[in-house]
Amino acid sequence: MLEFNQSQPLTLGVELELMILNRRDYNLTRGSDDLLLQINRKPHGYDIKPEITQGMIEIGTAVHSDVNAMLDELLAIRTLLVDSAHKLNLGLAGGGAHPFQHWEDQRIYPKERYKLVSELYGYLAKQFTVYGQHIHIGCPDGDAAVRLTHYLARYIPHFIALSASSPFYQGVDTSFQTSRLTSVNAFPLSGCMPVVDSWDAFNAYFERMEALGIVASMKDFYWDIRPKPEYGTVEIRICDTPLSVETPVLLAAYAQMLARRCFEESWNDICPEPYLTYSYNRFQACRFGFDGVMVDARSKSQLGLQEDLLDTLRALEPHAEALGSQHQLAALRQRALKCHSDSRWLRQIFEQSGSLSEVVRRQSEHWMYAEPGVGVN
């Protein structure tokens, strides 16, 4: 039986997967071991670790209740990473997928879990060289985590549109705002959590899947949102890694506002109807971003994603005030109003330069050096 470890409600943590680049043509390089060795020459106390292939590195924040403190920590981690990368002549970048790397060139990181994933999923493991942001939100108990997971499912298209940063993949423009999620879709346990209404019901589902030999732990579920019982959180896993160090904090603030509304209103309207259109709405956000549509199965209506996001932000104003996140709410509103996205900026660079290497060089410079408040648009 999975035990849900209680945590302070509405606390936050984020994880970011980053590209490791050579500085000749800005392709991925197998630099994670060398970079980690350089980073760990002196004690630092930050959560920095390898990921499934050797052109990736993951950073994680501590637990925060205040998003401004989270930004301060991310800036400090960035300083450490950039200093270490300079010593090795490496570049670092955000973005959901490298624009022109080829999956067959990647190497699995020599860690037992990654070896098992590679043995089970074959070439999909190397194709999983994509880069995401995960957001953890503290929950008081397992029942609250189940409710919040279902509540957030309605807003997943918003997170996709706000974070989309992978228009190019394997050297081509995909026509999508985010190509990263197509790699995630290939895994059999991707998608969304089943419609269970309590932690006991979730445990019964998990135990059945475990008894069937399908899963051994929660890590085997590649859902867009999942409870994380060992942390006492709900984890949003849908976002591309943004191009700047500030945008992850805006996304975390949005998640915190939504969670506060869910908890304050004692939301418990768990039913299967919203999941009838979940995959379609998710596709619309991946393909069209802010220009996508959202279909409401209950009201049998369609609404533009941008309009729905702006309506939601208006409804969250009292929660932003209570959390001290008015600045973040205003920044999110501006992005939605102007349809500002990382994907659009990357396409503009390619239109100007005609070079995907130049695209990656610019996105690397932005992640490594841009000051907070300096947007890509």
Swiss-Prot record:
Keywords: ATP-binding, Ligase, Nucleotide-binding
Function: ATP-dependent carboxylate-amine ligase which exhibits weak glutamate--cysteine ligase activity.
Family listed: Belongs to the glutamate--cysteine ligase type 2 family. YbdK subfamily.
Keyword rRNA-binding: no
Ribosomal protein listed as a keyword: no
Reactions catalysed, as given in the entry: L-cysteine + L-glutamate + ATP = gamma-L-glutamyl-L-cysteine + ADP + phosphate + H(+)
Pfam family, one: GCS2
Organism listed in the record: Chromobacterium violaceum (strain ATCC 12472 / DSM 30191 / JCM 1249 / CCUG 213 / NBRC 12614 / NCIMB 9131 / NCTC 9757 / MK)
Protein name (record): Putative glutamate--cysteine ligase 2
HAMAP family in the cross-refs: Glu_cys_ligase_2 (MF_01609)
